[in-house]
Amino acid sequence: MKRVFSYLYPFRYRMALGFLIKVLGTVAELLLPVVLTHILKTVVASEDLTQVLLWGALMLLFAGLACLFNIVANRMAATVGKRFSKALRRDLFYKTLTLDTAQTDAFTIPSLESRITTDTYHVHNFVMMIQRMGIRAPILLIGGVVITLLMDKALALVMIAVMPLIFVLVYTLSRLGIRLYGRVQTSVDSLVRVLREDYGGIRVIKALSKEKYEQDRFEIANQRLSKNEQSASFIMSSTHPIMNLLMNSGIAAVTALAAVRVAKDASDPETVVAFMQYFTLISMALMAVSRMFVMFSKCSASARRISEVLSTPAEIVKTKEATSTSDDFITVKNLSFSYAGKKRDLDNISISIPYGSSFGIIGGTGSGKSTLIKLLLRFYDADSGEILFRGKSIRSYTREEIAPFVGVAHQKDFLYAASVEENVRFGRNISREEVWEALTLAQAEDFVRALPDGLDTVLATGGTNLSGGQRQRLLIARAVAGTPPLLILDDASSALDYKTDAALRAALRKIGDKMTTVTVAQRASSVMSCDKILVLDDGRAVGYGTHAELLESCPIYREISDSQMGGALFE
């Protein structure tokens, strides 16, 4: 909570001024019954029309001031709330971009989305409520009680006797609500995850006719959310009816006592009228307090979830440069890594990738190919062993320092709802000519020129208005744009036909002196021309050498080659 509400500090003076204006408006509102009592007791009895008009005008003035001050204060509160939530969402989003990959995996993408949207919305609503009613309600409550005590202690004490019951009710339910709304937000995360998976894989779902299966998955998540929402709503919705019961009981008791006191001349009707007005104001204040506690329950759960992200320390940090050095672009020594800390996903891998060379990584599904690439990009740090990047330990670099040297195209990278040029440039200072050069190298020039607006053609989100091969070629163009020193193609040509794949490899060989290339593939044809090839199986290196050497020494590589291209081709 403290971390989240520290974002209000820059607005403290505006909030203080807003609170002051709100105090003035509330005081003006509290004075209305006092003026009314004076009119009923004194002015009406005097039968002086001028006095009636003057005191009536004074009531209108107080009412107008109360309205004006509240409007101004509420507008100031809206400005603070808008700027507060904007800054909070911005920093939360920036933090999600800098989370380590393992931390992102731990939070999950749907949960992070929910925290940026739903949770910040709950906190925003509470900040707005606390500015609008956080001062007004206590002043109405305390001021009303003080004035009623001065007017008629006996009636006031009856009213005050109800308040402890109300406060106990609100406090108990709000504490319970924090836990219940925490469960609701967790259920929202689960539902969002199912939605993301279903919408992202809608083509696969339709192709395999798995609509019923996904409906069942959604129904389970939806029922869990509904159950938790029902529990939270049932508890929190009980607040207002029970409060109304207590307040109405208090009003009934006050009315009965007032009738007795008026009959005995211990009080007068004018005082009772004013007293009932104050009782109404106090009731409104108590209802506002109850609403604030309900919103606090949601806000507290949401603020805790937001703080978890904002307070997460970076695990992958720049460390003091190690003494090991290398003349190669990348050197991997005895590298081991595990996602879950149990079974090793990579086990004792050692490779060398010289400057200007081409390096291939091949293996079956789950062999550790993409995991090795993630370690080379420092998405994760290895459990043991060492990676040297440009002659120095990779731990001596931040990810931001590695990024300018690397162009990466993954198999399932994302294309944005922007023009082709913007997708290839991706925020970098790259000329239009360089964009065309990248498209030509990626074998994408012809189809881009054939698009209705060429480079200015706007793509659908995810590039869904392109074929799979066209999307991959644009992703490769993005990776090679600007000629980065290291190009990593992580199964990035899997959707290309053999002819286009061969043309791409030929184009990359022509600029081999400008870039070091790492190609991850399941096709032997995609890596056969590489200077060195690493064969992975279940996280272990089972082959390392040239294409010809591996055909002789590595049964797994030979099996892949034979199954894909025919053994006679290589004999």
Feature roles, as predicted:
Residues 1-10, 112:
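A short amphipathic helical element positioned immediately N-terminal to and/or at the very start
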Residues 20, 24, 28-32, 69, ...:
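Hydrophobic alpha-helical transmembrane segments of ABC transporter permease domains
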